[in-house]
Amino acid sequence: MKLAVYGKGGIGKSTTSCNISVALSKRGKKVLQIGCDPKHDSTFTLTGFLIPTIIDTLQAKDYHYEDVWPEDVIYKGYGGVDCVEAGGPPAGAGCGGYVVGETVKLLKELNAFDEYDIILFDVLGDVVCGGFAAPLNYADYCLIITDNGFDALFAANRIAASVREKARTHSLRLAGLVGNRTDKRDLIDKYIDCVPMPVLEVLPLIEDIRVSRVKGKTLFEMAESDTNLAYVCDYYLNIADQLIARPEGVVPKEAADRELFSLLSDFYLNPKSNTTKSTADEEELDLMMV
């Protein structure tokens, strides 16, 4: 199974990806995480350091693929998760999609691409041009990381459009949204009412999730010394279980930009109407409970 993880820049894709990878590994799956970001820091939480990129390795070998060995580019991370960083072209030059293609090509040359139960592509930001949408060409499922905010959901809608486009050529599905570090989900619910798609999990606003990134550790590793964090790991294990079960997923029909802008901005501009609706729903629920 191949997964592509997208979301607004800074939303916590890499932290979420690393923890999902460990959760999948703990469920007995052999996992490879491929970082698809020129910053090459996707797997930092798994390895604790910035591993050399495939592009750097290929350049050092003058692009002689036959001179590259698996141990040159694949690094073992926490929980037995194997890690690769694609890297990227110099700033302002080249195409990230080309880099992803070269990464997949090399892994196939090394007979490594088919050795894993699950390959997870962690893709930079919400830039879904043809280049950085390239991982969707290889993926069975796309996951979108979001929060309960306007910008993240607007980005999610654009990513959903990319999924729909790529699904024309192969059996790609959107597995669903993962809410990251948010105490509320009312705006998420408002969005999925407009653009139906599953929500796999919503992680609460837990400071340790953010801190784990700085420490270069997954929540699972941190929980080894702080058992109070074990409950946080359960969120990621729940996501892993849903993915292992191969969800049906959806081919989303994204909202038009203006329609979505109006829908989401109304939530902020007219909070009273939203509060009134919420209160009415609660009163109805109370009556039903009686």
Curated annotation (Swiss-Prot):
Its main location: plastid. CDD domains: Bchl-like. Its cofactor is [4Fe-4S] cluster. Its EC number is 1.3.7.7. It is an enzyme of class 1 (oxidoreductase). The keyword Chloroplast applies. Transmembrane segments: none annotated. Pathway: Porphyrin-containing compound metabolism; chlorophyll biosynthesis (light-independent). It catalyses: chlorophyllide a + oxidized 2[4Fe-4S]-[ferredoxin] + 2 ADP + 2 phosphate = protochlorophyllide a + reduced 2[4Fe-4S]-[ferredoxin] + 2 ATP + 2 H2O. NCBIfam families: DPOR_bchL. This is Light-independent protochlorophyllide reductase iron-sulfur ATP-binding protein. GO terms for molecular function: 4 iron, 4 sulfur cluster binding; ATP binding; metal ion binding; oxidoreductase activity, acting on iron-sulfur proteins as donors; oxidoreductase activity, acting on the CH-CH group of donors, iron-sulfur protein as acceptor. It is found in: Plastid, Chloroplast. Mg(2+) binds at residue 14. It comes from the Eukaryota. ATP binds at residues 10-15, 39, 180-181. [4Fe-4S] cluster binds at residues 95, 129. Homodimer. Protochlorophyllide reductase is composed of three subunits; ChlL, ChlN and ChlB. Component of the dark-operative protochlorophyllide reductase (DPOR) that uses Mg-ATP and reduced ferredoxin to reduce ring D of protochlorophyllide (Pchlide) to form chlorophyllide a (Chlide). This reaction is light-independent. The L component serves as a unique electron donor to the NB-component of the complex, and binds Mg-ATP. One of its GO terms (cellular component) is chloroplast. It comes from Porphyra purpurea. GO terms for biological process: light-independent chlorophyll biosynthetic process; photosynthesis, dark reaction. Belongs to the NifH/BchL/ChlL family. Binds 1 [4Fe-4S] cluster per dimer. Keywords: 4Fe-4S, ATP-binding, Chlorophyll biosynthesis, Chloroplast, Iron, Iron-sulfur, Magnesium, Metal-binding, Nucleotide-binding, Oxidoreductase, Photosynthesis, Plastid.
